[in-house]
């Protein structure tokens, strides 16, 4: 809120990192209202890893220059069955985070469980459920693609303060498995 008592809009860039495709989604928040700005994908070509990471870094910087976000929300890495895939995903995350940090933007990180809980209300929701809820929450005419939807969901999670659709647990309580427990 500004000093004049007005609510100030905040622009959030959500990123869903991947070495082949990194989804991005930009939303504006004004109080509890969410407004879609843009979404898309940064794609890398097959080739040497350093070149692909540079493509991601440059792509994130270009998105930031175009849409001028105030904050960035990035999905955290999950541990895959294949350790090599996990390492590559971690490097892609590093490139997109460096892109944001090099533009002097604050970066928040959320697990997939937190993002799904925030957007769908269920931490183990299917990708299609996330796409559907992103479409509804942002009043989109069509469902965004899976990578863009995940990025928009990450931005929505950040707009919700990392909390689920039900909001934060009250003072003196904590949220666990969808319910508030007394301390």
Swiss-Prot record:
A GO cellular component entry from the record: cytoplasm
Required co-factors: Mg(2+)
Binding site for Mg(2+) 2: 75
Binding residues for Mg(2+) 1: 16, 147
UniProt catalytic activity: Endonucleolytic cleavage at a junction such as a reciprocal single-stranded crossover between two homologous DNA duplexes (Holliday junction)
Alphabetical list of CDD domains matching this protein: RuvC (cd16962)
Xref: Gene3D superfamilies: Ribonuclease H-like superfamily/Ribonuclease H (3.30.420.10)
Enzyme class: hydrolase
Subunit record text: Homodimer which binds Holliday junction (HJ) DNA. The HJ becomes 2-fold symmetrical on binding to RuvC with unstacked arms; it has a different conformation from HJ DNA in complex with RuvA. In the full resolvosome a probable DNA-RuvA(4)-RuvB(12)-RuvC(2) complex forms which resolves the HJ.
Family named by the database record: Belongs to the RuvC family.
Cited function: The RuvA-RuvB-RuvC complex processes Holliday junction (HJ) DNA during genetic recombination and DNA repair. Endonuclease that resolves HJ intermediates. Cleaves cruciform DNA by making single-stranded nicks across the HJ at symmetrical positions within the homologous arms, yielding a 5'-phosphate and a 3'-hydroxyl group; requires a central core of homology in the junction. The consensus cleavage sequence is 5'-(A/T)TT(C/G)-3'. Cleavage occurs on the 3'-side of the TT dinucleotide at the point of strand exchange.
Protein name: Crossover junction endodeoxyribonuclease RuvC
Gene: ruvC
